[in-house]
Amino acid sequence: MNYTFINDFLSSNVFNNCQSIIINWKYYGDNDKLYYEPKPLRERFIKPVNITEEIMKNEYIYSAAKSIVRGGLHLIWGHFPHYFKNTVNCRPNGKILEDYLSPPDHSKAYIKHYTTKSTEEFIERLNKGDVYYKFDTFYLNYKIKEYYFLFNKIKKKKLNWLIIN
């Protein structure tokens, strides 16, 4: 069943026994765009990232999700930021999620996660620094090698743009 309103989705009977609904991210990369375009994200980045073996090796990226938790619950302990121990965690189709490392399920609902946007926008974000890393060579190399090219194809134009900027 498709829902127009989030309230109808959350009120569905399939969630009667669920204490939280775990909604996986669907990743979007640069879609081979080098430059910013003044259009909404959903119009600029329409093709999701193919889930590769490299992405699957990174459990935090592979199983990233947001949770909707039922109110009035006590003693919820988040072993993983979006999966709660000793609670009934469900997927958007109402099936119980046994393990937070289960493959993502995008069949009923997902959250679009625009990881890098265009190459230009990624560089702009890099230049701002990061809350976890001070702005240094390690940070730049990590973000470009271990993050940007995890989601995007390596192409000469992108490499030149990343090196020059």
Enumerate the predicted regions with their spans.
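Catalytic-site signature of metal-activated, phosphate-bearing donor transferases
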Residues: 1-165
